[in-house]
Amino acid sequence: LKRAVNKILVLSIWEDIWSLGEGGGVADELQFIRHLTKNGIELHFLIPRPQARKETLQDSLLTYHTYPNIFRHFRRLPGIAQRLYWAAAFPPAVVGRLEKLAAEIRPDIILGFTHHSLYPLNRIGRKLDIPTAVKLFGVMYLDRFDFPRAKYLLRSAEQIVALKFPVDRYIILNDGTRGEMALTRLGVPPEKISFLPNGMDTEWADVPVNRAEVRKAMGLPPDDILIVTFSRLIRSKRIELFLRAVALMDRPLRERVTIVIGGDGPERQRLENEARRLGFGDKVIFTGVIPHRDVVQFLKASDIFGATNELTNMSLPPCEALLCGVPVVAFDVSGTAEIVRDGETGLLVPDRDVAGFARRLEVLVRDDELRLRLGARAAAFAREHFVSWDDRIEMELDVLERLVSEKKRRRGIS
C-alpha cells in the first residue's frame, strides 16, 4: 500500500529524547522515532543545539539538524519573564533555519512539538505549501477557565497568542489537561483537532513480579505498606502536599507505612528538609531517578500511589500505577477523574484538601481488602482503556496520512 507520508520534518524544543533524565523515562518522542523509522519513514529533527554531545538513536532514516538554543538563556528569570522571553526569541532563532531545511529536503509534512512551533509552522507551511501539524503533549493551564482572568492570562498568555497562528491539524495528547475542550473554546475548529490517548507500556500488566525480591533489591522495607509517588521533582508536582498529608495521618497507621518518592529535580533538597521538619524523615525514602526498565517492578512492589500534581493527575505515572494494579489517591484536578474513578480505581480528593488526602490514605492503609480490590479494578480498567505505544503512534501516523492525502488530492497529485 502506497503511503502519503514518507518524509517528516519535525520541529522540536527538546535537545534530547529523555523525559526524566538520562534513562529515567521514555519520551513520546522516542516511541515516535522507533515506530516510524521501523516503518521506513524518513525523519529530520530540527532541535536546539545541545550544550554537550547527547545520546541519540542510530538509524539511517533519522537525521538531526540544530538551531540556536535559546532555552538555555535567562534560566534564572522568574517563570513568566522566562516564558515570555522564550516565546519572543524562538521564532527568530528557528524560522530561517526551518525554511531553508524544508526547501532543501521537501518533507511531506512539517510536524511541530508544543505551542512554540505554531508561528514557524504557520509561516513556512504557507510559504512553501507544505502541510503542517502541531503535537501538543498537554496544554498546561489552558483549560482552567475557572481561574480569575488575570491569573489565567499570567499562566497561559504565550499559548493564547501562539494559537492565533493556525496550522492544518492539531494533535492533542490526552494527559488530563482537557486540551480538546480548551482549544475549541479558544477558537480552533473542532474538525481540525485530533484528540489522542497517551501511549502506555501495556505489556507491563502481564509482567510477573516477586514483591519480596524487588523490595530487597531496592532497599525497601519488606513488610511496610509502601505509599509511593514518582515524577520530576518540580513545584507543580506539589510533593510537599503529599508529605503534609502523610504527616496528618493517624500516628499508629503512619507507623505501618514507608513513603517512597521516586525521581529527581530542583525540589529534592527542599522536600527532604520538609520530611524532616514534619518529623518523619526516617520513614521517607528518596530513590532518585528510577530507570524506566525498573518502574514496573517498583510499582508492582508498592501498595498505594499518591498523586498531587497541580495540572493533572492523569499523567503517565498515575496511569502506570493503575496498569500495575496500584490504587491511586489523587487530587481531583482537570481530567483526573477520567482514570481515577472514586471507589473503583482509587480515591479522589478535592484539590488542595490535604486533610482529606490524609483521610483517604488512612482508609487504604487500614483496609487491606479494599486496597486489594481497588488495585484489581485499577488493573482491569487499565487493560480495557489504555493503548500500547505502537497503537498510539499508529493513530498519529493515520492522522498525518489523511492530512497529507487530502492536501495532495486538492493539488491534483496522485
Predicted regions and their residues:
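N-terminal subdomain of nucleotide-sugar transferases
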Residues: 1-53, 58
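Short His-centered aromatic/hydrophobic patch
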Residues: 112-117, 136
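Membrane-proximal helix-turn-helix segments that form the acceptor-binding/catalytic region
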Residues: 140, 151-171
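Carbohydrate-associated surface elements
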Residues: 176, 199
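Short alpha-helical donor nucleotide-sugar binding micro-motif in glycosyltransferases
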Residues: 289-290, 297-302
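Aromatic "clamp/platform" in nucleotide-sugar-dependent glycosyltransferases that forms part
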Residues: 310
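Short hydrophobic beta-strand element within catalytic cores of glycosyltransferases
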Residues: 327-330
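Conserved acidic donor-binding segment of nucleotide-sugar-dependent glycosyltransferases
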Residues: 342-343, 347-354, 363-368
